[in-house]
Amino acid sequence: MEGTCFLRGQPLTTIPSLPSRKGFLLQRWKTNRIVRFSGFKNHSVSGKSRSFDLSLRASGPIRASSVVTEASPTNLNSKEEDLVFVAGATGKVGSRTVRELLKLGFRVRAGVRSAQRAGSLVQSVKEMKLQNTDEGTQPVEKLEIVECDLEKKDSIQPALGNASVIICCIGASEKEISDITGPYRIDYLATKNLVDAATSAKVNNFILVTSLGTNKFGFPAAILNLFWGVLCWKRKAEEALIESGLNYAIVRPGGMERPTDAYKETHNLTLALDDTLFGGQVSNLQVAELLACMAKNPQLSFSKIVEVVAETTAPLTPIEKLLEKIPSKRPYVPPPKASVATKEVKPVPTKPVTQEPTAPKEDEAPPKEKNVKPRPLSPYASYEDLKPPTSPIPNSTTSVSPAKSKEVDATQVPVEANVVPVPDSTSNVPVVEVKQVEEKKERPLSPYARYENLKPPSSPSPTASSTRKSDSLSPGPTDSDTDKSSTVAKTVTETAVATSVTETSVATSVPETAVATSVTETAAPATSKMRPLSPYAIYADLKPPTSPTPASTGPKEAASVEDNSELPGGNNDVLKTVDGNLNTIPPSTPEAVPVVSSAIDTSLASGDNTAQPKPRPLSPYTMYADMKPPTSPLPSPVTNH
């Protein structure tokens, strides 16, 4: 029943009385005038009540619409967990939310203003095909259409029924932009009336759909405030829900005008914290799926404010996991109904009967637990046939034998003690293990003391290595070592001197032997104090490299020079190469040269033994008989004719 009329001029003060109407009431608020008619004579219908709302606008028509609500008794103490009330069920988001709830197995009470406008919703539900449905049940059977006007507080309570969850999807229509009171009446006042009714009905969960940018100013979401401050009124509705004390969940979706249902095939859903997003798009179907998931999992959506958009770069993630990442404003508190039901089920008469015969068993249980505490950590103590890996046991060696015998005994003790798997024997095992730990302190650090066949790496030891051993092992040399080293030094020096004596002359043999004996006598105390630097004194078979011994450089060298030179005075040439002077000197006697060379040879021989060749000649020509110094051609003497 609808009627329209126009009002012009001054504000309305009186309306002619109608014969068939009683209780005429006129209310005025700002520029909007609401005329309410209540009570009819002889038009009452059992179980139904009719009311007419007449909205008066300054420059628009007056519409009178009748809303029929079926009154149903409600029990505040009992709520049906599978029953959900959806406000705004004929809208874009509400109709899809109803279908998603039916897919999850919920029973839905769809709140609409007019049952005639719910025909498309009922037809879409009939075309649904549920995957998991009981035999003989259809989705339409779980749907209830309830006519209710949220601007009237009296009609909301009967429409809720025993619903445990309320989903509010209402909002001012974008088509009625000229209605400046739309955001206030629908987005705030109607939502607040629904919150108050839900509080009095003590519902378990309330889910509210608002928009991005309701709390914090941000572009481009703030542009919506040009539509008569719609974001401000939505924020007022959120505050009313938060202050009510209900278990709430607030969903702030992005733009839903352009995206279609196929939008989810290319764009995945993303959730963000409150006051973080100010732009983005999401489809109505994706928002409906989120609302249905929140109704099914109240512990995941408890006291959360979620902002929803869809992006192509976002990964495909289940909604449950996305909700887990959003923190809750307060800790989750389960509904009291579940706790009462569990308390009634727990006391069963059969439980105390089963506990009486088990009472003596509980007395026997404590000693078993005490025996389990000293359980050995080694698995070899639990099995008789299982032996620990053993290494080859060496024979007794010097001072390490007592420690090895202790360790061998310690490894054999747990095997004998665990022959019978009795809990008493296991208690003795830890005592043996403690002894092993204490005895390990006496273990030698060297592995060569453990195994007989294992020898340390050794270098080849020489035959006469007394001096080397005395230096490395003993603190100082002994008398026997000094005697051996002195004899070796004597043999070396005597052989060197003998070769030089045979080649020079018999006259020089006496001083050479004297020099050799003096060298050996002086070298003997040196070997007792310091280690010889030459390796040839250590090994008997090792000989030093020998160079060809030159012949005596006495009269032979002088004779050869005179014979080869064309002019007399060949000795002058030899002395010239040695001294570097061209002056002639008288020739020396042939006996003086061998004496000098023998002195040089003896000094060289003594220098080889003492490693101090002080009188060694600078010229190499005196050492070798066949080696001659270079000679320059001498000019012939000039004769005066």
Curated annotation (Swiss-Prot):
It is a peripheral membrane protein. Residues 599-612 have a biased composition (Polar residues). Residues 1-63 form a transit peptide. The modification N-acetylalanine is found at A64. Residues 630-641 have a biased composition (Pro residues). It holds the Pfam family NAD_binding_10. GO terms for cellular component: chloroplast; chloroplast envelope; chloroplast inner membrane; chloroplast stroma; chloroplast thylakoid; chloroplast thylakoid membrane; chloroplast thylakoid membrane protein complex; cytosol. Residues 393-402, 485-528 have a biased composition (Low complexity). It is found in: Plastid, Chloroplast inner membrane; Plastid, Chloroplast stroma; Plastid, Chloroplast thylakoid. Involved in protein precursor import into chloroplasts. Part of the redox regulon consisting of TIC32, TIC 55 and TIC62. Acts as a membrane anchor of LFNR1 and LFNR2. Has a NADPH-dependent dehydrogenase activity, but only after preincubation with lipids. This is Protein TIC 62, chloroplastic.
